[in-house]
């Protein structure tokens, strides 16, 4: 095994976390069609190869029964696995060694703070207070979207504060299946788009705006293949009650309960 990758995924190693934070910090804040960043170099090449080689088996995923993801026969084109550290500990030893530092990084306060700093203006405009006072709860997931997956134009639900998605393709051949940003949800504005390149060790993030952050994913084909991504969504947790709600939902995963969102 490559020594660089071994050091990156060492249990308790801050390297993955710091690489994520640095990727956020060096990313340019773009304002069109809405505030967002496109991150590159999220992993060094050796670590990225190690991550893909340790992709969890399908038995650890469950169907996400979202309306846009369902086939006519009722099955889902989107497979989801939660990346909370306690869920990752169920994996076989080699997969666990690689994915546990990633899971911890996605749930880290330093990564949360990096996104808050980057999107300070938009978040403070929406919530009417300093970002330091905006409570959020991270929900990290690993996704394997099967051919036929699509999602229509939407801005994300009000319970979300920040949406983040990391792309995990094997190479650049899937470049054209990245998320599409729109200027509006319908009419001419919906046709004015910006697409995020679906490239190795890249990703995007944006602060959720109920009137601006319109995005979609075009339906994939058999030729496109499987679309593998990793997400962390920061849900609004501005009170002890809402924080407990997200924490309790996390606890219920231990008993096989899987929410639609």
Tell where the protein language model's regions lie, with residue ranges.
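Short, Φ-rich (hydrophobic/aromatic) sequence segments
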Residues: 1-12, 98-114, 163-167, 233
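N-terminal auxiliary "cap/dimerization" subdomain that precedes the catalytic jelly-roll/cupin core
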Residues: 1-81, 255-261
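Catalytic cores of PAPS-dependent sulfotransferases
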Residues: 28-33, 39-57, 107-122, 145-146, ...
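Active-site rim elements
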Residues: 37, 96-110, 150-151, 189-193, ...
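Hydrophobic residues positioned within well-ordered beta-strands of beta-sheet architectures
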Residues: 39, 138, 162-164, 230
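Signature of the catalytic double-stranded beta-helix
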Residues: 79-138
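A contiguous catalytic/ligand-binding core that recognizes phosphate-bearing ligands
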Residues: 120-136, 141-162
């Amino acid at each position: 095994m490559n020594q660089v990758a071994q050091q990156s995924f060492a249990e308790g190693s801050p390297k993955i976390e710091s690489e994520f934070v640095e990727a956020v910090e060096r990313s340019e804040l773009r304002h069109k069609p809405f505030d967002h960043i496109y991150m590159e170099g999220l992993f060094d090449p050796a670590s990225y190869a190690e991550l893909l080689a340790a992709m969890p088996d399908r038995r650890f995923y469950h169907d996400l029964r979202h309306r846009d993801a369902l086939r006519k026969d009722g099955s889902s084109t989107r497979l989801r696995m939660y990346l909370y550290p306690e869920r990752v500990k169920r994996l076989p030893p080699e997969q666990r060694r690689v994915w546990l530092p990633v899971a911890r990084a996605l749930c880290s306060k330093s990564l949360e703070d990096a996104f808050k700093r980057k999107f300070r203006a938009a978040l403070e405009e929406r919530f009417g207070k300093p970002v330091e006072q905006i409570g959020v709860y991270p929900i990290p997931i690993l996704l394997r979207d099967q051919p036929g997956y699509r999602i229509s134009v939407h801005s994300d639900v009000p319970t979300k504060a920040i949406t983040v998605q990391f792309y995990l393709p094997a190479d650049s051949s899937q470049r054209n299946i990245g998320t599409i940003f729109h200027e509006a949800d319908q009419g001419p504005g919906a046709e004015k788009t910006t697409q995020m390149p679906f490239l190795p060790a890249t990703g995007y993030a944006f602060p959720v705006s109920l009137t601006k952050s319109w995005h979609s994913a075009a339906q994939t084909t058999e030729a496109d293949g499987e679309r593998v991504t990793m997400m962390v969504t920061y849900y609004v947790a501005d009170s002890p009650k809402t924080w407990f709600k997200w924490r309790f939902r996390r606890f219920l995963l231990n008993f096989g309960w899987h929410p639609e969102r």
